[in-house]
Amino acid sequence: ISVIELDPNRNILRHQKVIEKPYHMSYPFVFRERGSYYMIPETASNKTIELYRCTEFPDIWEFDRYIMKNISATDTTLFYYNEKWWLFTTLDQTGGISGGSTELFLFYADSPLADKWVSHPLNPVVSDESSARCAGNLFIRNGIIYRPSQDCTIRYGRGFYLQKVTMLTETEYKETNEKKIKPEWKKDLKGTHTYNFINGLTVIDVYTYHRRF
């Protein structure tokens, strides 16, 4: 996991590695709680959901705890709503056949630093490779909850949806496809699978192919 610092014109000032492990890490979900920054990176290849605490922002992060172990979870995302913390994650229970993009599981707790998370009774709350896997932070716009989700049909990172969450309680969960975003705004783009924004800055990733010769 690395950090990149930008100037006001979005030019890169520096980049620095902040967490390195002998297994794959990606999708760094960052949040603030009790005056500290925390991060949940994807560590599915280690069969864990891990929590890190920042001791010197943004460069120094220390392992805090395992949120869950013996679990193949991808793109874990937290969301605070109605005095509960909700944990969204896609679980691969097929031994790697599904790739961890088909089933969305939901858990909840009173604190993001909780030792135990309660599994939602409707799990998996979504079973659809076109919309199960999270693509960024959930957000509220005009009173409506939106969940960015990856479209993993045909290939990984094909595009993403904005899902409208219409019901989120300890016993119910409902969402509908609101809008699909494809990488069509520039020639030669092949895919996009992450959407986030904060303080007026929107970040969308894309990938393309380049000839090496």
Where is each model-derived feature located?
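Carbohydrate-active catalytic/glycan-binding domains of CAZyme proteins
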Residues: 1-213
